[in-house]
Amino acid sequence: MTGQAEAIRRVHPTVSPKQAAQMLQEDGVIILKSFLAPDVMQRFQAEVDEDVEKTSTGARMKAYKLVNDKTKHMADLIVRSEVFRSDILTHPLYHAIADELFRADYGDHWLNASAVLQLMPGAPAQQLHRDEEIFAASKFRSPTDPQLSLSCLVALTEFTEENGATRLIPGSHLWDSAHPAPSPDQTVPAIMQPGEAILFLGSLFHGGGENRTENVRRGLGMSLIPCQFTPYSSHMHVPRTIIETMTPLAQKLVGWRTVESHRQYPFWQGGDRRLEDVLGLASREA
């Protein structure tokens, strides 16, 4: 993309999944109007408000370098919210679009992460990044290769340029490794009303904006990844009494402990904590 930054296309919720997926392949991002019904959003907010208020600002783990000290990142929504489990996680259009993007190349998809993201007054702009960068495989993708993730950010408050609306570079998912680094003047803000959502590919450059107001900016983020990013065999059915006779390395190899990527990014967590800590998992010494 060159010259003036392109606007983000806004689409009605009656859009067909195939049309939406085609727009994502072309632009890397779309805004979906009326993604969440007002009553769903209100019930979700009521369930998480108290926990969000109790959540401290800043990163819970050192790998979360994109979470600054004026941002709240509250994960573990499966545990915290029945509305998220029942009405949001299984959003039909979101999953139908993901099927269009992933199924032919990968098969099923699953939840990568979910969190409430709240920018406090004075929160600085986030560094521009691609969500797929947490996966080493992203280094080997060409712009025309299958995508590695599909992110969704729902506005729970109004998103304005002044309060830190997410900024994105439409078309940047088509940039190869030789392309110059992205710059803020290439971005456009995702201006949204509560209940609207941005969907964007993991290969698209984006970042949270600066909150220059006295109000918070709250969003609900979640991302889907292909099922290829999981072991062929599950070991969750193995009795815990057996697992706790194993060494920490053996437990990690069968999926009972958090693992780390090439950038020490934690995968397979329990909310914002290491899985073994949440479980209180015992082990035998090596």
From Swiss-Prot:
Fe cation binds at H129, D131, H206. Disruption phenotype: Impairs the synthesis of both terretonin and terretonin C. Keywords: Dioxygenase, Iron, Metal-binding, Oxidoreductase. Pathway: Secondary metabolite biosynthesis; terpenoid biosynthesis. It comes from the Eukaryota. Coiled coil: none annotated. Pfam families: PhyH. Its EC number is 1.14.11.-. GO terms for biological process: terpenoid biosynthetic process. GO terms for molecular function: dioxygenase activity; metal ion binding. Disulfide bonds: none annotated. Its cofactor is Fe cation. Homodimer. Belongs to the PhyH family. Dioxygenase; part of the gene cluster that mediates the biosynthesis of terretonin, a fungal meroterpenoid that acts as a mycotoxin. The first step of the pathway is the synthesis of 3,5-dimethylorsellinic acid (DMOA) by the polyketide synthase trt4. DMOA is then prenylated into farnesyl-DMOA by the polyprenyl transferase trt2. Methylation by the methyltransferase trt5 then leads to farnesyl-DMOA methyl ester which is further subject to epoxidation by the FAD-dependent monooxygenase trt8 to yield epoxyfarnesyl-DMOA methyl ester. This is Dioxygenase trt7. The gene is trt7.
